Amino acid sequence: MEIAMKVERVVAWLREQVEESGTTGLVVGISGGIDSAVVANLIYRAFPNQSLGVILPIRSHQDDIDDGLAVAIACGIKHTTVNLDNEHENVLSKAINALQKLELYDENKLRISDANLRARLRMSTLYTIANNVNSLVVGTDNAAELHTGYFTKYGDGGVDILPIAGLTKREVYQWGEYLGVPQSVLNREPSAGLWEGQTDEKEMGTTYEMIDDFLEGKEVPQKDKEIIERLHGISHHKRVMPPLPNI
């Protein structure tokens, strides 16, 4: 019952955000993960006829695409797929070639710059679509990701509103169960699908359970506490506006 009340509160909040912004609907990128699945369900409840889910594969695993489609079909949201493979390859190859000509290219930094490029291409596409249908772009970051900075600046962090940023990862799963998210999505290990074997927890160096406990004020091992505090500190710039000089 508590989840039901909170869900209705967020749905009402989504309607308020749209009304205050002068827009008429909501757009979300659906990745096939639990966070975007929950958000897709929430925005569909708020605007059954004016919500849109966009699946944006970029050299994505077929399982991710299938889970994204399953989410959209299960919740009933209007959805479309925009494949960005060619656009990604075009931008990445041109950037690499430009740096190679200047002898500045660093192969060791390709993986992270590639991952961030994918997130930013998706963001640009979502805003292009949202502008055309007079909608807000809805983010999918949860409290753990927001606190640790586990998102791409001006990528998946480039959104208008963040309806589940107050939920821990475990709460997101609880909401997913309540909202009827497909079991395949509930069972999958959290991953951005950026490269083979990539998972959120491997990349962060700690677990969502530890981060959730930390955010709830519970005791966590010193090693995990230090990792969480370090991630929060180095990602501060992602949560604020760019600095300005005092001229």
Swiss-Prot record:
Its EC number is 6.3.1.5. Catalyzes the ATP-dependent amidation of deamido-NAD to form NAD. Uses ammonia as a nitrogen source. It comes from Alkaliphilus metalliredigens (strain QYMF). It is an enzyme of class 6 (ligase). One of its GO terms (biological process) is NAD biosynthetic process. PANTHER family: GLUTAMINE-DEPENDENT NAD(+) SYNTHETASE, NH 3 /GLUTAMINE-DEPENDENT NAD + SYNTHETASE. The keyword Ligase applies. Keywords: ATP-binding, Ligase, Magnesium, Metal-binding, NAD, Nucleotide-binding. Homodimer. Pathway: Cofactor biosynthesis; NAD(+) biosynthesis; NAD(+) from deamido-NAD(+) (ammonia route): step 1/1. The gene is nadE. ATP binds at residues 29-36, 140, 169, 191. GO terms for cellular component: cytoplasm. Deamido-NAD(+) binds at residues 120, 153, 160, 237-238. Pfam families: NAD_synthase. HAMAP family: NadE_ammonia_dep (MF_00193). One of its GO terms (molecular function) is ATP binding. Mg(2+) binds at residues 35, 145. This is NH(3)-dependent NAD(+) synthetase. Belongs to the NAD synthetase family. It catalyses: deamido-NAD(+) + NH4(+) + ATP = AMP + diphosphate + NAD(+) + H(+).
